[in-house]
Design a protein with these regions (language model features):
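Acidic, glycine/polar-enriched metal-coordinating patches/loops
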Residues: 5, 71-166
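Residue-level detector of beta-strand structural context in well-folded domains
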Residues: 17, 23, 54-56, 114, ...
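Extracellular beta-solenoid/beta-roll
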Residues: 29-69
Length: 166
């Protein structure tokens, strides 16, 4: 048969074998069957002894979560992009979404994410509860969650929230 003549790792992924994919994989389900089921999964987190300030480039192709462990030192802008060399507009198709989280450590003086850009272009997010945050939460960790939906060519809707953890 074709499968018995195939080579594991070259012609197919052998069960129980760790495999790294470097290109997008498409799994098509149907109207009655899900395309993919995960018993467990891990997301890549970048942990950095960095303070939130200025413009922070968030490369969504290399991390799902960023955790800044030093106290924020000023309000900041998050610029979402695929990577330093690829725009998010290029990496995503219309109708696709990506969800990422930015964890920010706050000291006794708290700051907040006061602007969002995608590929350097300003975007006005829709915040949970309808109101954008106007401050951070002192002596805690603020978790900013962003769901970015591509709605057209260079057009995005961002759903955002800020949650305090102590």
């Amino acid at each position: 048969t074709a499968i018995s003549a195939a080579t594991a790792g070259t012609d197919y992924v052998a069960p129980g074998t760790a495999t790294t994919f470097t290109a997008a994989q498409t799994f098509n389900g149907s109207s009655s069957v899900l395309a993919a089921v995960f018993a467990n999964a891990a997301e890549t987190t970048t942990i950095a002894a960095t303070a939130a300030t200025g413009t922070i480039n968030y490369d969504v192709t290399t991390q799902s979560v960023i955790y800044y462990t030093s106290n924020a030192s000023a309000n900041w802008t998050v610029n979402f992009r695929a990577s330093s060399g690829t725009s998010l507009d290029t990496a995503m198709a219309t109708g696709q979404s990506v969800t990422v989280v930015f964890l920010v450590t706050q000291g006794t003086t708290a700051y907040y994410n006061n602007a969002i850009t995608i590929d350097g272009t300003s975007v006005t997010p829709k915040y949970q509860g309808g109101t954008a945050p106007t401050a951070g939460n002192a002596s805690s960790i603020d978790a900013y969650s962003y769901t970015i939906v591509k709605t057209g060519s260079a057009a995005f809707t961002v759903f955002a929230s800020q949650t305090q953890f102590k």
